[in-house]
Design a protein with these regions (language model features):
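Canonical alpha-helical transmembrane segment with a positive-inside/aromatic-interface signature
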Residues: 1-39
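Short, hydrophobic beta-strand segments
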Residues: 7-9, 46-54
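Helix N-cap motif at beta-to-alpha junctions
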Residues: 16-17, 55-60
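Short amphipathic alpha-helices in soluble, non-transmembrane regions
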Residues: 22-30, 61-74
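Conserved short beta-strand edge segments in small beta-sheet-based binding/regulatory domains
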Residues: 33-39, 67-85
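Non-transmembrane, membrane-adjacent beta-strand/coil modules in membrane-associated proteins
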Residues: 35-49
Length: 85
């Protein structure tokens, strides 16, 4: 059985970080659906917060691989993944 899982992904980037469009493409390619996006800009840092939906088995509680991949991307300073609900 597959279920819908909601989560909040927060990425803090410096000036050399990827563009929002590139992040969105990575999330879409990983089969995550973005429901909402917010941005906090503070000087040279930007924090994007994405409310996402992932379809997965209830037994599969691991963090999606794309989250780890984004965390290794140059210019991304911090990553937070938190299930919602």
């Amino acid at each position: 059985m597959v279920m819908q899982v909601r989560a909040r992904l927060a990425l803090t980037l410096d000036d050399s970080g990827p563009a929002d469009a590139d992040i969105r493409r990575s999330l879409r390619d990983a089969a995550l659906t973005i429901k909402e996006t917010s941005l906090i800009a503070d000087g040279g840092r930007r924090t994007y917060v994405y409310e996402v939906i992932e379809m997965r088995s209830p037994a599969d509680a691991k963090v999606p691989d794309v989250v780890d991949a984004l965390g290794r991307h140059p210019g991304i300073r911090s990553v937070s993944w938190r299930p919602v609900g």
